[in-house]
């Protein structure tokens, strides 16, 4: 017969406290507005930091000079950040349904050498912020995300949320991560 051993379980518990700042500004990419550069420099690590910007392409119709402004901002603040690329993506739920787009973003993050000390800036509505957040959270053990919501709904939902999700297998928000933003800029 097998002798039954009785023992008390070892129970482990941990808590993770995390905070991030939400800043309100205008003309985020104006060269004289140092907010974005200040937020990146505040991590206390030596710079410049690699930064990829992923932007809802619907914004470009209303702000045709935005990509040029982002490039100029990167040049003006090159002591703090190195702009590796700006990637326009289609907005809305279509971006969260496209596994190929997410894989392409992750491949781009790898190709430009982003790591967990780098930043991805997501600019757009809630669906784009969710998709970009998911791609960043699942690449290289998590790449820091700065969210820039451009709709009222995104400001109140994904712009300040803790989850990043994509749609898969015909189900909305099936794949999800819990990963807080490094910062929110609104």
Question: Model-flagged regions — what are they?
Answer:
Residues 2-118:
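ATP/NTP phosphate-donor binding region
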Residues 23, 30, 137-186:
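A glycine/threonine-rich phosphate-anchoring loop and its flanking beta-alpha core
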Residues 52-54, 85-87, 121, 146-148, ...:
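Hydrophobic/aromatic beta-strand patches that form the interior of the parallel beta-sheet core
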């Amino acid at each position: 017969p097998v002798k039954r051993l009785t023992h008390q379980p070892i129970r482990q518990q941990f808590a993770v406290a995390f905070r991030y700042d939400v800043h309100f500004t205008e003309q985020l990419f104006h060269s004289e507005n140092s907010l974005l550069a200040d937020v990146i420099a505040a991590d206390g690590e030596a710079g410049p930091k690699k930064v990829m910007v992923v932007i809802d392409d619907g914004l470009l119709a209303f702000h045709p000079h935005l990509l040029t402004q982002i490039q100029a901002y990167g040049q003006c603040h090159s002591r703090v950040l190195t702009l590796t690329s700006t990637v326009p993506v289609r907005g809305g739920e279509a971006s969260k349904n496209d596994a190929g787009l997410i894989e392409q973003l992750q491949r781009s993050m790898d190709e430009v050498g982003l790591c967990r000390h780098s930043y991805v800036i997501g600019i757009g509505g809630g669906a784009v912020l969710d998709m970009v957040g998911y791609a960043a959270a699942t690449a290289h053990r998590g790449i820091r995300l700065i969210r820039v919501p451009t709709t009222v709904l995104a400001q109140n939902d994904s712009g300040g949320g803790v989850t990043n999700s994509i749609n898969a297998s015909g189900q909305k928000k099936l794949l999800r991560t819990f990963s807080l933003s490094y910062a929110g800029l609104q």
